[in-house]
């Protein structure tokens, strides 16, 4: 069954052109990132993310108006772009952002897209699923050049066995992840997503995270801590309790929390997390 592009365009409020060009690619990345939130509520509640078919992803992110994590966002975007005539390859990445230099090598639990189209002159990277630091523009697969986006600049650097993606965060180049351009079959991504959504030590199982992007800000939620990052600085807000967290997920991040089931069960699970979060006794 083909993906329902009309439903997807309605979900992201897109009314523009659909021919496979760089302008259309930029527009889709922009509106997708501003409309469909990043969230990990399914893994948090013990629901594996192991069906990455176009039907399953469209059902959750489009029809049920939920968000998702990288395998869902980039999975859906890849299907959409392929339907529009782009050539899409799926890559795997190893997230190293905020890791200590001597930390153990992490598994490849991230995915991104390599996209080409008539006249592209090369490959563009598309990643609408990196949560709080999602690139808001397609990036040329070209090392060394600083590439502006609708938010902060990014750049790619060579590594012996591939590339690293870096972002300018607080006036410092920070490495987000390492990747190669080896095309990954769907089964590899399914296994990685199952691991990320079920392993007891996975951050998606042990903690709550959500993110959404606006024209001038990045809104990131980690547990009860809400951060609003703008060019002029960061505003930090500590939410009072689980009820406030659920309200924020619904009202600020646009997540259809009613789709998840009993609100009480979600609040109970979040309460468990907040009790373990540093500074849990502080309002």
Curated annotation (Swiss-Prot):
It is an enzyme of class 2 (transferase). Is thermostable. Retains >95% of its activity after incubation at 60 degrees Celsius for 30 minutes. The keyword Transmembrane helix does not apply. It catalyses: an arylamine + acetyl-CoA = an N-acetylarylamine + CoA. Pfam families: Acetyltransf_2 (PF00797). GO terms for biological process: response to antibiotic. One of its GO terms (cellular component) is plasma membrane. Gene3D superfamilies: Arylamine N-acetyltransferase (3.30.2140.10), Cysteine proteinases (2.40.128.150). Its EC number is 2.3.1.5. Was identified as a high-confidence drug target. Homodimer and homotetramer. This is Arylamine N-acetyltransferase. It comes from Mycobacterium tuberculosis (strain ATCC 25618 / H37Rv).
């Amino acid at each position: 069954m083909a993906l329902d592009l009309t439903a997807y365009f309605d979900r992201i409020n897109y009314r523009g052109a659909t021919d496979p060009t760089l302008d259309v690619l930029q527009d889709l990345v922009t509106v997708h990132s501003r409309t469909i939130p990043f969230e990990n509520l399914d893994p948090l509640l013990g629901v594996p993310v192991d069906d990455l078919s176009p039907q399953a992803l469209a059902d959750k992110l489009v029809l049920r108006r939920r968000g998702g994590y990288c395998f869902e966002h980039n999975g859906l975007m890849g299907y959409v772009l392929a339907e529009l005539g782009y050539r899409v390859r799926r890559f795997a990445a190893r997230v190293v952002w905020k890791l200590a230099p001597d930390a153990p090598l992490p598994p490849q639990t991230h995915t991104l897209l390599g996209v080409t189209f008539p006249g592209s002159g090369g490959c563009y990277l598309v990643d609408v699923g990196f949560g709080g630091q999602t690139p808001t523009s397609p990036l040329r697969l070209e090392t060394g050049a600083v590439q502006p986006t609708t938010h902060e600049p990014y750049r790619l650097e060579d590594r012996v066995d591939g590339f690293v993606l870096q972002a300018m965060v607080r006036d410092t180049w920070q490495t987000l992840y390492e990747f190669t351009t080896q095309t990954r079959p769907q089964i590899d991504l399914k296994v990685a997503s199952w691991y990320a959504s079920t392993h007891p030590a996975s951050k998606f199982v042990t903690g709550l995270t959500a993110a959404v992007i606006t024209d001038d800000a990045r809104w990131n939620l980690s547990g009860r801590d809400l951060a609003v990052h703008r060019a002029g600085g960061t505003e930090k807000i500590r939410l009072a309790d689980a009820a406030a967290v659920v309200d924020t997920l619904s009202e600020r991040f646009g997540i259809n929390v009613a789709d998840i089931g009993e609100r009480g069960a979600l609040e109970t699970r979040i309460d468990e997390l907040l009790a373990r979060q540093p500074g849990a006794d502080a309002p």
